[in-house]
Amino acid sequence: MSLLCRNKGCGQHFDPNTNLPDSCCHHPGVPIFHDALKGWSCCRKRTVDFSEFLNIKGCTMGPHCAEKLPEAPQPEGPATSSSLQEQKPLNVIPKSAETLRRERPKSELPLKLLPLNISQALEMALEQKELDQEPGAGLDSLIRTGSSCQNPGCDAVYQGPESDATPCTYHPGAPRFHEGMKSWSCCGIQTLDFGAFLAQPGCRVGRHDWGKQLPASCRHDWHQTDSLVVVTVYGQIPLPAFNWVKASQTELHVHIVFDGNRVFQAQMKLWGVINVEQSSVFLMPSRVEISLVKADPGSWAQLEHPDALAKKARAGVVLEMDEEESDDSDDDLSWTEEEEEEEAMGE
């Protein structure tokens, strides 16, 4: 008769007749989850990946046990500072917007790159991805020689890495066509000839775009402890070579490239203040976790500052109005001669 072992970290089936004192390799301790790290109280190994945590090999040998283990009793006696920090509930009242405004740094500090930590599981996934690629595929497949810059108004052609050193002069706006006139929304030069319209020099200088990256609508959320905020972006196989996360004490800028050249980008003004030097990023096969250490312990009412959320909401309304105007075209906003005559007769 085969029974299921209930020891933590084992989960194997065993025969009671052959159950020896050293048949089971398990964890006698309890799971610990603290500051995005996961592990067992009985051994020192820690990981940020939950699947790696489940696969941590047991640290103690003993017999298999088919009975469900009782819940571990709470330790008696004085608790250590670390255990208090782990068990301390988030019972701090969120600070008001006025308090946050007074305490926020007055000057905008420059953004700093946060260190990237690559999990072992992601390293293995990237190695397997490289093995599965056809010969000649890889980074060179993302940018091919002879590729044209995709920015409107720029006619540069990719010849190699040195092409990135040349400036890109382009139009950041959208083309407009109204009553035979052609122009760009970012500059006011109008022309009748389509060839002259295409030949208009760009009005902004930036970096070349050799291949449009697909914007990824990734699911993302956040959670917090008393001393930490963790922003999680979900996506398959983040590519470390193309990823960066920058932060200041009050801002967070995220640029994550996943497999398939899909890109997640976000800019946030944070609710509270963080310690940039102690913050970091963890890359895993199915997600990216951004761990932000709070400058002061306490609870955040939300991830982003209310002023930033209000500004985004207003920008969303403006964008929606712009899209409606572009759908209706500019003709709806102009008067024809017949309409002017009808208006005059009506008066």
Curated annotation (Swiss-Prot):
Region (Disordered): 319-347
Domain CHORD, first and last residues per copy: 5-64, 149-208
Positions bound to Zn(2+) 1: 5, 10, 24, 64
CDD domains in alphabetical order: p23_melusin_like
Top-level taxonomic group: Eukaryota
Subunit-structure text: Interacts with beta-1 integrin subunit. This interaction is regulated by divalent cations, and it occurs only in absence of calcium.
Intervals of motif SH2-binding: 158-161, 234-237
An MF annotation (GO) of this entry: integrin binding
UniProt keyword list: Metal-binding, Repeat, SH3-binding, Zinc
Protein name: Integrin beta-1-binding protein 2
Notes concerning its domains: The tail domain binds to the cytoplasmic domain of both integrin beta-1a and beta-1d isoforms. The presence of Ca(2+) ions does not prevent binding of a fragment consisting of the second cysteine rich repeat and the tail domain but prevents the binding of the full-length protein.
Protein source organism: Homo sapiens
CS domain boundaries: 215-304
Function in brief: May play a role during maturation and/or organization of muscles cells.
Keyword Metal-binding: yes
Biased composition regions of type Acidic residues, renumbered to the chain: 320-347
Amino-acid positions noted as binding Zn(2+) 2 in the UniProt annotation, renumbered to this chain: 27, 42-43, 59
The keyword Repeat is assigned to this record: yes
Example of a GO cellular component annotation carried by this entry: Z disc
Tissue: Expressed in skeletal and cardiac muscles but not in other tissues.
Residues at which Zn(2+) 4 binds: 171, 186-187, 203
Biological processes, Gene Ontology terms: centrosome duplication; muscle organ development; signal transduction
Motif extent (SH3-binding): 28-31, 70-78, 172-175
